[in-house]
Amino acid sequence: MKTLHNNYCNSKQGYLPLFLSDCLDLLDPVLTFERLMGGIDLNKYLTDIPEYTTGRLRYNPVNMLKTVLFGFMTSGYCSLRELEDNCKVNIRFMYLMDHQTPSYRTFGYFINEILQDKIENIFNDINHAIFNDEHVDLQHLYIDGSKFEANANKYTWVWKKATEKFRYKLYEKITAEIEEINAEIAWSGVQITTNPEYVPDYLNEIVEQLVLLWELDTSTFVYGSGKRKSKEQRHYEHLTTFCQKLQEYIQKIEICGPNRNSYSKTDNSATFMRIKTDYMGNDQLLPAYNVQIGVADEYIAVVDVNHYRSDMDCFVPLMEHFKQTYGFYPKYPVADAGYGSYNNYIFCEQNGIEKYMKFPMFKKETKDRKYHEDPFRAVNFRIDEQGVMRCPNDKAFHFLYRKNVRGNQYGRKEELYECEDCSGCPYAEKCKKTDKNRTVRINQELTSMHQEVIENLESIHGALLRMNRSIQAEGTFGIMKNDRWYKRIVRRGIHSVKLEVLLVAIGHNLYKYQKKKMRNRTAA
């Protein structure tokens, strides 16, 4: 029988080549990665690792960092077990780790303890190296956000408004309890003051005073069936329970903070949001994080993780983060209709940023001619020679008053106008929905901003930017979620989640860089 295999070497006999690099192709991703990392000083982030006097010598921290980053580059998201396994069987990881095989616990300690406070600076240094090599244009920034489901149980919500309602009901119970106690201790001349609201320290002080007044011994309290509690014991237990419950409500409201209305019990940093991918099929809120990215020439230039459910509140923090990283604001931030608000437009004007963010009614204003030319819209009303606004029936609208818009940080005001007389108007059914004279709200400043945005985005430059935003910003999330299978947050806590998202962003940029280098060398 003819031999179809080589039999001149075996597992007990060494053979050439002796170096792993000789087994790799010149265009191999790990060699491209190694050349890029060679131009970055990684040692400065790894000098403060604590020294241990017992146990084995530590692994080379630079090799550990390269291995972690390369794992996220190749897999999108690389678990600790995958890193451990790759170091044992994958020749590329063997090359980076010099044949050493750290355990998953070692990788976990290195990521969670060593890289926690340094990962953002590492992300920025890698970006600077890539951007200088690729001549990335940072003046055009394509912004998008996506909600990633948190690693939290689904039915563990805490609602801020419900907690506040329960707290006020508890105040009423405390007041009723104190009034009952006052009636029983009237003989002593002691009166406990009732308040509209209470704090736990005040209740603890009341309990201490009652213990002294009644000379209570908690060791003599009775429990269980067949035993009757005294009035003093009942009042003591009620006040103690109220104090614990009040402390719980205060803690829940503090965790929510002023900028969100819910959180999860298993991940206090996660906020309940409505996610597009409703796999439960009941339109239910799920614990999630709002991940914001700014993309420049297909690379993630800036990334942020927020509690906010709306993208409008995420624009300014993302721009400030961009300036903190690169020293300037982008000239042309391009975003969808979720970012176009009065606050964001004013921020752009104050910092010399062009307005290329759509507003919520942008599509209807530009695509729906019937809506845009509707004669019953206040913005389409005629202005006569005296500057008075007149409706299609030629009735004058008189100024009523100005009012502040709630939740606006720049003091935005709306002007309210009322029609002089709508009785007998032939257009009443089309113009208004009530029997009263029609009133309209107008903000000329915001209307002029919307017109400026339309002119910017409808220009040739604006059309190209809109097209590029759909390709680059939304395409980046598409690659992360569907091509590289990162669809859900793994870690818990806002700091750990930011660490994880930054690692995924670094992996994406390295992946893009390697793909572009491969295409260029193949074409050459």
Where are these regions (language model features)?
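Hydrophobic alpha-helical membrane-insertion signals
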Residues: 1-31
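A ubiquitous short alpha-helical element
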Residues: 2-5, 51-55, 461-464
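Peripheral, non-cofactor segments flanking catalytic/redox cores
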Residues: 9, 94-102
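Short secondary-structure transition/capping motifs
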Residues: 22, 55-60, 72-76, 96, ...
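Basic, short loop/linker segments at the boundary and entry of helix-turn-helix/winged-helix-like folds
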Residues: 26-72, 444
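A short secondary-structure junction motif
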Residues: 39-44, 90, 94, 483
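Anion-binding and metal-coordination hotspots
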Residues: 68, 76-89, 100-524
